Amino acid sequence: MNGRLLEIVACPICQGRLKYDSENEQLICHFDHIAYPIKQGIPILLSDQAIGLSTSLTNPEQQNQ
């Protein structure tokens, strides 16, 4: 994922920053606890395509407790 693209792309629901998850090829919104898939290098930023995530996946500091 292009770092410059990550600087300008935002969650279409809350307009918050997205974090790139290279292992699962998705962009994560920590605020809404959802992920947007990346297909063939293109982020699919449609709310109906978003995948719900558990809180522990979106808050890495909780995993270390």
From Swiss-Prot:
Pfam families: Trm112p
Classification via InterPro entries: Trm112-like (IPR005651)
UniProt superkingdom: Bacteria
GO CC aspect terms: cytosol
Homology family: Belongs to the UPF0434 family.
Official protein name in the record: UPF0434 protein HSM_0997
